[in-house]
Amino acid sequence: MLEALRTAGNPGRGAHEPTLHASRLVYAARCAISKLLNAPDPSCIAFAANATQALNTALGGLFAPGDHIITTVCEHNSVLRALYRLRDQEGVQLSFAGVDEKGRLQYDGWQGLIQPNTKAVV
């Protein structure tokens, strides 16, 4: 444990060498991902503890009351919970695209779901 305390650093949480080293590694990762995704700047890249946290952060910051989102009932629970929260607490409108008896998306009905205030298909 003492070895970990002496050598481990928490990025952005101090000025000792292990922390500075960790910060440089995180920045290098941001640069590499930024380049891969053609992002305008490494600061546009955000890390999260897991996919659910990232999804909630992204969805929670993208929509305003009155915005419309198209999704399906087949989405993962973490997606649907985030969308239902946006609907129930933020006034976002949801439409659900249909699926057939085997759970396959029925694309022929999607165009009819698009509204002037549609901001995303999730």
Each predicted region: which residue ranges?
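Pyridoxal 5′-phosphate
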Residues: M1-V122
